UniProtKB/Swiss-Prot annotation:
Residues 1-19 form the signal peptide. This is Putative lipoprotein MIP_01412. GO terms for cellular component: plasma membrane. Pfam families: Myco_19_kDa. A lipid is attached at C20 (N-palmitoyl cysteine). It is found in: Cell membrane. It comes from Mycobacterium indicus pranii (strain DSM 45239 / MTCC 9506). A lipid is attached at C20 (S-diacylglycerol cysteine). Keywords: Cell membrane, Lipoprotein, Membrane, Palmitate, Signal. It comes from the Bacteria.
Length: 139
């Protein structure tokens, strides 16, 4: 009986420690819209996560979509980076301190990010291109 009590205690301790160190579940939003050079695209796969004051928003798939990183500790909150993957025939990025720009507004859990990104047209990957973008997502 003592061995069962010790074993049960060990299992309970391991479960509690595992719960303390696991990451919170990723919030999945219903939809996001991404507009690049006037081409609108709606995505139904949106994953939002947060580490301390940094919010990561992953839209779409690895083949087509966008990833937005927001610094919510800044006053006001700012967009650190935007990576666009094959939306409207464009792939590229904006990075804070680099070329391009990004303006962000946040109302509750709704983020709107718009600006310009540098990259390439997917049908002409060897030629640099710039694009305007607007991303609206709720996390």
């Amino acid at each position: 009986m003592r061995n069962r009590t010790v074993a049960a205690g060990a299992v309970l301790t391991a479960a509690l420690l595992g719960a303390c160190t696991s990451h919170p579940p990723t919030h999945i939003s219903s939809t996001a819209s991404v507009t690049v050079n006037g081409h609108d695209r709606t995505f139904h796969i949106v994953k939002c996560g947060q580490v301390q004051w940094t919010r990561m928003i992953d839209i779409g798939s690895e083949f087509s979509g966008a990833k937005v990183v927001v610094d919510e500790n800044a006053q006001p909150a700012t967009t650190q980076s935007v990576r666009i993957r094959n939306v409207g025939g464009f792939s590229g990025m904006y990075s804070q301190g680099g070329d391009g720009n990004a303006d962000m507004s946040m109302t509750g859990d709704k983020f709107t990010v718009s600006g310009t990104a540098n990259g390439y047209q997917t049908d002409k990957p060897s030629e640099p291109a710039a694009a305007t973008f607007k991303i609206v997502v709720t996390c």
